[in-house]
Amino acid sequence: MIAQELEVSLHMAFVEARQARHEFITVEHLLLALLDNPSAAEVLRACAVNVDDLRKTLTNFITDNTPTVPGTSEVDTQPTLGFQRVIQRAIMHVQSASNGKKEVTGANVLVAIFGEKDSHAVYYLHQQGVTRLDVVNFISHGVRKDQQSESQKAPDGVEESTAEGQQKESALDQF
């Protein structure tokens, strides 16, 4: 049900949170782990994300805002409700999709993160210019963000013909 690559990413997120003695593992921890997930990283690159900048921003946010557990005993890091909802949302989406896919990948979790509208993870993705639509377009249709902007531009011939048309008299003036 969960792809091996996603299991590794989730495990690494928990290990890093535990080593940093964080009391909670958050959606931001999850997004940080997805930066190293092959399927999620491919989607982020296709959406023109500066991965290094996003990694630095997330690391700083997590360091500054995640409560830590004092002492030297082993830490029992707990997932936040937002973290749990993201994973559940990704699983439910894959189960309900009728495209024959059975495994949840990092790309599916990336889409599910956008459901947590009030999270800093979504805010940082929006800062990078990424929307849920960009991610879904790439996953579903292979449309890269840079291809979207090129296809929205008018063809060269259209611009020239309109410029020539403005120099000619309008149909009403010709009448």
Predicted segments, located by residue:
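Histone-fold recognition with a strong bias for associated Lys/Arg-rich disordered tails
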Residues: M1-F175
